[in-house]
Amino acid sequence: MIQNGINKDFINKDKSHNQKITKLTVMCMVYKEDGSFLVENRLKKDWPGLTFPGGHVEDEELIIDAVPREMKEETGLEVSNLEPRGYIEWNEFGDDVRHLAMLFKTKSFKGNLKSSKEGEIFFIKEEEIKKYPLSNDFLEIYKKLK
């Protein structure tokens, strides 16, 4: 079956490479002219502490479409004019699962902030970061997004 120019029967047919499962996610830094930026103080045990809002890219969804969807779901904000800022990757469950997070930033947003069961959403300045517990790789991600 060919879908979007990709033969789905061909993908992962060659098991000699022992490829890991890759989970594709997005993260976005929303920032203001005063230097503050949006963070989430996550409560979930799988990724606790300060992080940037984001989430998983759905099957058949374009990465660039996942960012506004996830930002609306997690923060209540509508974002636009996204600037790609690179990526980070890490392994989970030993080496069985690879995570690849595409990073974006923007100062174009509208709407009202809303927190969720995953954690509190708020704007913060760089000098306030040390007051909070940080998620894994937060400082590395922050440096890429600055």
Feature locations, PLM:
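Conserved Nudix-box catalytic region and its N-terminal flanking loop in Nudix hydrolases
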Residues: 36-73
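NUDIX/MutT-family hydrolases
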Residues: 103-105, 113-145
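Active-site-adjacent beta-strand/loop module that shapes the phosphate/pyrophosphate-binding cleft
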Residues: 88-112, 145
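Short, acidic, Ser/Thr-enriched surface-loop or helix-capping motifs
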Residues: 31-32
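A short coil-to-beta-strand element that immediately follows conserved catalytic motifs
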Residues: 78-86
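Acidic, metal-coordinating catalytic segment for phosphate/diphosphate chemistry
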Residues: 1-27
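Residue-level preference for beta-strand/loop junctions
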Residues: 22, 80, 98-100
